[in-house]
Design a protein with these regions (language model features):
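A short helix->loop->beta-strand "cap" motif at the edges of active sites that frequently abuts
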Residues: 76-80, 126
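SDR active-site strand-loop-helix element
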Residues: 15, 40-44, 81-86, 91, ...
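A generic structural signal for well-ordered alpha-helical segments
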Residues: 4-5, 74, 121
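Catalytic helix-loop patch of NAD(P)-dependent Rossmann-fold dehydrogenases
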Residues: 61, 66-69, 89-131, 135-136
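Conserved catalytic-core motifs of eukaryotic protein kinase domains, centered on the activation segment
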Residues: 50-57, 92-96, 141-142
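N-terminal Rossmann/SDR dinucleotide-binding element
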Residues: 1-39, 117
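NAD(P)H-binding glycine-rich loop region in Rossmannoid oxidoreductase-like domains
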Residues: 25-64, 75
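NAD(P)-dependent short-chain dehydrogenase/reductase
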Residues: 122-166
Length: 166
C-alpha cells in the first residue's frame, strides 16, 4: 500500500506499532482526529494462531480491542473502516467458498477473537467493510511461499501436503 500511495494524488498516513498502539483507545482517537482520516485500513492483528491458545488476552487486545478502538474512532470522525479479518471465523468444514452470511463457528482463540473484532466493528455504528482473508503472502514476513522457496534451496526433496484449499 505504501508503494502504491506514492503514485496517488491522495494523502496517506501509515503507522506501525512503534508509532501508534492501536490497543490504546485514546491514542487511536487522537491519531484519527489529527489526520482527519476518511478511510482507515485495519491490518493490525495477533496472527500467531498457535500462540493465541496460550495468550488469549493478548490475542483479544489486538483482534477485538484494537478493532473496536478503530471502529469507534472511525464512527466519531465520519470515516470508513476497512477491517481485515480471517477465514478462521469458520470451522473449515465447507467444501465451497464461504459466503458472507455463512454461519460462523471458530474453532480456536484466534478465530474467536477475530470474530469478536468483526462484531465490535459491526456494532460500533461506523461505516465499514470487512474482508475475510486466507492464505495471504508477500515478500514480507513468514508465509508458505517463502518457506517453500527457502526449503527448495536447502533440500533435495520435499514432502508437502496437497489436499488443502484456501
Amino acid at each position: 500500500m505504501q508503494r502504491l500511495s506514492a503514485v496517488s494524488p491522495n494523502n496517506y498516513t501509515f503507522t506501525d506499532v512503534a508509532e501508534l498502539d492501536v490497543t490504546d483507545a485514546g491514542a487511536v482517537r487522537q491519531a484519527v482526529a489529527q489526520t482527519r482520516a476518511e478511510v482507515i485500513v485495519n491490518c493490525a492483528a495477533y496472527t500467531n494462531v498457535e500462540r493465541a491458545e496460550e495468550d488469549e488476552a493478548a490475542a483479544d487486545r489486538l483482534n477485538r480491542g484494537a478493532a473496536e478502538n478503530l471502529a469507534r474512532a472511525a464512527e466519531a470522525n465520519g470515516a470508513t473502516l476497512i477491517h481485515v479479518s480471517t477465514d478462521y471465523v469458520f470451522d473449515g468444514t465447507a467444501h465451497l467458498p464461504y459466503t458472507e452470511d455463512a454461519p460462523t463457528a471458530p474453532l480456536g482463540v484466534y478465530g474467536r477473537t477475530k470474530l469478536a473484532g468483526e462484531r465490535a466493528v459491526a456494532e460500533s455504528g461506523c461505516k465499514y467493510l470487512t474482508f475475510r482473508t486466507a492464505w495471504l503472502y508477500s515478500e514480507y514476513g513468514n508465509n508458505f511461499l517463502k518457506t517453500m522457496l527457502r526449503l527448495t534451496a536447502e533440500k533435495e526433496r520435499l514432502n508437502v501436503v496437497f489436499d488443502q484449499a484456501g
